[in-house]
A protein has these predicted regions:
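Transmembrane beta-strand segments of Gram-negative outer membrane beta-barrel proteins
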Residues: 17-39
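Surface-exposed strand-loop-strand hairpins of Gram-negative outer-membrane beta-barrel proteins
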Residues: 33-53
Length: 484
């Protein structure tokens, strides 16, 4: 049974076990994952189950062309994500209460408005201050009576300190009130913009792999293999709710794109004692993807950012380079008694160097972080590499029936984690059974239960926005094989 659930975006585990089967061999299978992942946002609201069920098929064909040369074609879906929030929480749009800006950002807007009001006041002449004070009292300065009152008040302003203080205080208060109204309008407009979005936060990522493997056995029991990998990737993300602040309403659609990479490895086998050992390296694969991005209206409402956001929105988007990670698989198997084998798999995936920063998202993040250096941030990234271990025992019960039990552990890819996949690693326990109606055919099935690691969920800027605990998943797998 394939991995089904793992750190970051890992899914299939990228096994090449089918290629190391003796003779000619074909298999096809499917895995189904039913996760239950829920938590609370920082306001104490329940998120409900945000993890979507998904299934992914796999297939493999291995041909023993000569005694020393073999060829394999493997299909799998190595990476992916499927998640969506619903209900009433900070990851779902609320058309009444959503706020586009953090309390700190709102404070900055009001402070900036008041600073501008103070600067304008400081540059006013005595005549302008007196005129502003009288107009605030309803005096019409275009009339003769108004001009007389203006002259008398200006004389008093210039010759009486108490009157000067009184007028200055009133004019500055009026300027601050006007500035506060303007700042409030900015905040209100930003809130209106994000409240126009609908639905909950969602993410979907799909990949497909075709591996073309050529093997050479230069000496008995040893196989060297290498080949090319063709991969496609597509996906989309929608950010909704207060948790995402100015990015509430952001959408990105990644069109399907293709890339190529390679794999290489070596295997050592002694069939007489059911011994197998193999190590496989898979390269990273670059994808230059076209991305459609929308939803920057909240930040545009801030006067200091309007021009920059308009320029970003109007400019053609650069292609997004997505690099799926390199990995290493170590597979071990050995007979430990008659009709009984022990097996283990160790997998490393280089998630620490993986990130996604769409062009416009990245530019907007640089504008949003201008006050702190303007370095911006990624839409998705991970802080650690993934390590996973699966080990178990299989036993042939009769000529037609066999079974196995296994236990697994996954390190996760760091904590805090993205709100789009808020778990950190797992432990699992699995059982499987295989029925062979003929020596050349079999049907195998299995089930695994996952205890998912607790995690704090953060948004792209690094702010923790939720806590996810006591989650689990169950996976099912079915596979059929044929030797010919």
């Amino acid at each position: 049974m394939t991995v089904a659930f793992a750190a970051a975006l890992d899914r299939s585990g990228q096994s090449i076990a089918a290629f190391l089967q003796p003779g000619n061999y074909f298999e096809a299978g499917i895995s189904v994952l039913d996760p239950d992942v829920s938590g609370k946002d920082t306001s104490g609201n329940n998120t409900g189950d945000m993890a979507g069920d998904y299934y992914f098929p796999g297939a493999a064909l291995k041909l023993q062309l000569t005694d020393k040369i073999s060829f394999g074609l493997l299909y799998d879906q190595p990476f992916g994500a499927d998640a969506g929030y619903s209900g009433k929480n900070n990851f779902v749009t609320n058309s009444v209460t959503d706020r586009a800006l953090t309390a700190g950002q709102e404070t900055e807007i009001f402070a900036g408005a008041q600073a501008r009001a103070q600067a304008i006041f400081n540059n006013l002449t005595a005549q302008e201050r007196v005129g502003a004070a009288l107009r605030a009292q309803g005096v019409d300065l275009s009339t003769q009576a108004g001009q007389v009152q203006f002259a008398n008040t200006l004389n008093a302003y210039n010759n009486s300190a108490p009157i000067k203080t009184q007028i200055d205080t009133a004019v500055l208060a009026g300027a601050n009130a006007q500035a506060n109204n303007q700042a409030q309008n900015i905040v209100n407009q930003a809130n209106t913009n994000v409240r126009a979005a609908t639905g909950g936060t969602q993410v979907e990522v799909d990949t497909q792999n075709l591996s073309f493997i050529f093997g050479l056995s230069p000496i008995k029991n040893v196989t060297l293999y290498a080949g090319g990998v063709y991969q496609t990737i597509e996906g989309g993300v929608s950010l909704r709710g207060n948790a995402y602040s100015i990015y509430n309403g952001y959408d990105a659609k990644i069109k399907e794109t293709k890339g190529t990479g390679w794999l290489a490895g070596a295997a050592y086998q002694i069939p007489e004692i059911a011994l197998k050992a193999s190590v496989t390296y898979r390269s990273e694969i670059d994808h230059d993807a076209n991305v459609t991005e929308t939803g920057f209206s909240a930040l545009r409402a801030i006067p200091t950012a309007t021009a920059a956001i308009d320029a970003i929105a109007a400019a053609p988007a650069e292609k997004l380079t997505i690099t799926t990670p390199q990995s290493v698989n170590l597979d071990l198997q050995s007979g430990i008694m008659a009709d009984t084998v022990a097996f283990a798999n160790i997998r490393w995936v280089n998630w620490k160097d993986f990130s996604i920063r769409p062009d416009k998202f990245g530019q907007v993040s640089e504008v949003a972080t201008a006050a702190s250096g303007g370095n911006g941030f990624n839409l998705i990234n991970y802080t650690d590499d993934q390590w996973s271990v699966n080990a178990g025992v299989g036993r042939k019960v009769t000529d037609k029936w066999a079974g196995n039990v296994s236990v697994g552990w996954d390190s996760g890819a760091g904590n805090p984690v993205s709100t789009l996949g808020p778990t950190e690693g797992y432990w699992n326990l699995g059982v499987g059974v295989q029925y062979s109606p003929t020596p050349a055919t079999f049907i195998a099935g299995g089930v695994k239960y996952f205890w998912l690691g607790d995690a704090d969920a953060n948004v792209s800027s690094g702010t923790v926005v939720g806590e996810f605990e006591d989650n689990n998943a169950i996976a099912y797998g079915l596979k059929m094989g044929y030797r010919f």
